Each structure stands twice: as C-alpha cells, then as structure tokens.
C-alpha cells in the first residue's frame, strides 16, 4: 500500500504535459481509453436538444408530390384513402403537391404511400 501512495505522490508532481504523456503511454501499453464512460441515465438526465433530436418521429404527413402518367389510378387511390368524392379527389391530384393524410402513424403513412406509389404517384413522408 505504501508503494501505491508513493506512486500517487510521484504522479502528483508531474507537469500537465508529463501527465498527458503518461496517460497516452498507459493507453498504448494496456489498450484502454482514459475517456470517461457515458451512462444512459446521465445522458437522459442532461438537458439539451441532442436527446430530443434523436427521438423518433411518431406522426407523419403523406404528401402527394407529383401525379405521374397514371392520373386516373392516382385519383382512385386518393379517393379510397381520403374518402373524398371524385371532384374533390381530382382537384387534390391536380393541385399537387398536396398533403393527402396528416398526423398519421408511421405504419399507416407507409401503407398510404405504398398505395399511392403503386398507382403511379410520387410521394413524400414528412
């Protein structure tokens, strides 16, 4: 135990440059890192935008970007998705880009997007 205390005393006498070189040499010799470990609890408790930015989006808007060559099939798909009448669905398709569905779950948004893409439309999830 006395040898450990003596070693600590000797390390305490090192300059910052020498201490940095000692840390680097120990990292190289033993294959370890002196960087502090980050625990999930500490990261979650830390205030800031990083944790919020990594949260997964839960609500999506499905936007019809372009109609494509198969306009009639896209109108049919829009009618079946939205429940709109023929005239309203045609106006929506003609006015693209338009949001077809707002604030829907990821699964529903993907289902709607697939249906529109299969009809020939260009779609974007926001």
Swiss-Prot record:
Signal peptide: none
Pfam families: Ribosomal_L12, Ribosomal_L12_N
Gene Ontology BP terms: translation
GO molecular function: mRNA binding; structural constituent of ribosome
GO cellular component: cytosolic large ribosomal subunit
Record's keyword terms, sorted: Ribonucleoprotein, Ribosomal protein
Family stated for the protein in its record: Belongs to the bacterial ribosomal protein bL12 family.
Subunit organization: Homodimer. Part of the ribosomal stalk of the 50S ribosomal subunit. Forms a multimeric L10(L12)X complex, where L10 forms an elongated spine to which 2 to 4 L12 dimers bind in a sequential fashion. Binds GTP-bound translation factors.
Function: Forms part of the ribosomal stalk which helps the ribosome interact with GTP-bound translation factors. Is thus essential for accurate translation.
Protein name from the UniProt record: Large ribosomal subunit protein bL12
């Amino acid at each position: 135990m006395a040898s450990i205390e003596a070693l600590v005393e000797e390390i305490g006498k090192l300059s910052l440059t020498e201490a940095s070189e000692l840390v680097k040499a120990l990292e190289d010799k033993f294959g370890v890192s002196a960087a502090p470990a980050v625990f999930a609890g500490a990261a979650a408790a830390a205030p800031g935008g990083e944790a919020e930015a990594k949260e997964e989006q839960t609500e999506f808007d499905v936007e019809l970007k372009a109609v494509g060559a198969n306009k009639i099939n896209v109108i049919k798909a829009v009618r079946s998705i939205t429940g709109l009448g023929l005239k309203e669905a045609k106006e929506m398709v003609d006015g693209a880009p338009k949001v077809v569905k707002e604030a829907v779950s990821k699964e529903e948004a993907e289902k709607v997007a697939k249906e529109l893409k299969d009809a020939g439309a260009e779609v974007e999830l926001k």
